[in-house]
UniProtKB/Swiss-Prot annotation:
Lineage: Eukaryota, Fungi, Dikarya, Ascomycota, Saccharomycotina
Originating organism: Lodderomyces elongisporus (strain ATCC 11503 / CBS 2605 / JCM 1781 / NBRC 1676 / NRRL YB-4239)
Composition skew (Low complexity), residue ranges: 281-299
Region feature (Disordered): 1-39, 183-205, 223-248, 277-315
Polar residues composition bias: residue spans: 191-202, 223-241, 300-315
Protein name: Chromosome segregation in meiosis protein 3
Subunit structure: Component of the fork protection complex (FPC) consisting of TOF1 and CSM3.
Annotated InterPro entries: Csm3 (IPR012923), TIPIN/Csm3/Swi3 (IPR040038)
KW Chloroplast (keyword) present: no
Length: 350
């Protein structure tokens, strides 16, 4: 009887030890850790946010390594290209004078010179990209800058201003506009615009233009009240003459089109009874016959002595004759088919 009792006590001890071990492993049953379950009493460690390097407006527009570097140094690149072209032209001229007068520069040599020039241009932009965004290679940097140009409205506006400045320089160099008058015009327009905005301010403190007002119209009214007119950009004499010639050519073409549109004589196929007869002429004194275009014009039956053209004109166009011939051919073909069917029936009956 002692052996079963010993085995039962051992089993009880083992079950107690297992339950204790499970309780020790469960953190919810630990009274000392009740307040630290959610980590409330643990000290907080504040860390600075890691900055991610990216190509943005700040990096491209404001930093000296961005677009300001290109605007400042792009003329040097153009100067280097011009120097290389002049050097290449001098070398080819020496070859032409020393070798033979019929010497021509080989095409491959021209291509090699262009490749060297493009290589120097790419090297310039590679250095610029590396200075602006060192973490990316040249291909990735060009891709990032291109995407920023599509997304950023500030960069698009900046690019538009640069293009307008270059167009203005070209117009001044070619004599299309006068630089001094254009600058005065822009200054007067800016002054008129500021005066218009200040004049529209009321006692309520509204600094915006009133609804429905046109800024340019307000500017004209303001300048007219002061007894002044807005200056217009002056053109050179050559440009003015060219504009006058263009206007004259356009007006001549428009007049010819209007004259052609007003010609409705081709619609008078059948004149009415009350219509006035055409004035007699030398060509209309003889009886008219069928013309080459298919028109049948008979002589006047009421006045056979003069032989003037009759008011009633009968039109017989070529396409009507063709349709009539086709109808006659179809009728003949139908007659032939009916005759063949009758012969076949007679043959079957036999």
């Amino acid at each position: 009887m002692a052996q079963p009792s010993m085995s039962l006590t051992l089993k009880r001890l083992e079950s107690d030890d297992a339950s204790r071990s499970l309780q020790d492993m469960d953190p919810l049953n630990d009274s000392s850790n009740d307040n630290n379950i959610l980590g409330i009493d643990e000290p907080l460690k504040l860390k600075s946010k890691k900055r991610i390097a990216k190509v943005d407006n700040e990096r491209v527009l404001n930093k000296p390594q961005g677009l300001p570097y290109l605007i400042k140094n792009h003329h040097r690149l153009g100067r280097i290209v011009e120097q290389r072209d002049k050097k290449f032209a001098k070398q080819e001229l020496r070859k032409l004078q020393s070798i033979h007068h019929s010497y021509k520069t080989p095409r491959q040599l021209k291509y090699d010179h262009e490749v060297e020039t493009l290589g120097s241009i790419l090297h310039f932009y590679q250095l610029w990209c590396h200075g602006m965004f060192p973490k990316a290679n040249f291909k990735d940097c060009a891709y990032l800058v291109r995407n920023l140009g599509h997304r950023s409205s500030q960069l698009r506006l900046y690019r538009r201003e640069l293009i307008e400045k270059e167009i203005f320089k070209l117009k001044v160099s070619k004599g299309i506009i006068d630089e001094s008058s254009e600058v005065a015009t822009r200054e007067s327009e800016s002054d008129g615009f500021t005066n218009t905005r200040s004049g529209n301010n009321d006692d309520s403190g509204d600094i915006f233009v009133s609804t429905g007002d046109n800024v340019y119209q307000n500017q004209m009214e303001f300048s007219g009240a002061q007894g002044q007119e807005l200056p217009s950009p002056t053109l050179s004499e050559q440009a003015t003459e060219q504009m006058e010639r263009n206007d004259a050519a356009v007006s001549a073409v428009a007049a010819a089109d209007d004259e052609y549109d007003d010609d409705w004589s081709f619609m008078n196929l059948e004149l009415g009874i009350d219509a006035a007869p055409a004035p007699p002429s030398s060509s209309s004194s003889l009886p008219l016959s069928k013309s080459s275009n298919g028109l049948l014009n008979g002589s006047d039956k009421n006045n056979a002595e003069t032989g003037t053209a009759n008011r009633e004109q009968y039109n017989n166009f070529d396409y009507e004759n063709e349709i009539q011939n086709e109808n006659e051919n179809e009728i003949e073909n139908e007659d032939d088919i009916d005759l063949a069917m009758e012969l076949m029936r007679e043959h079957d009956n036999i």
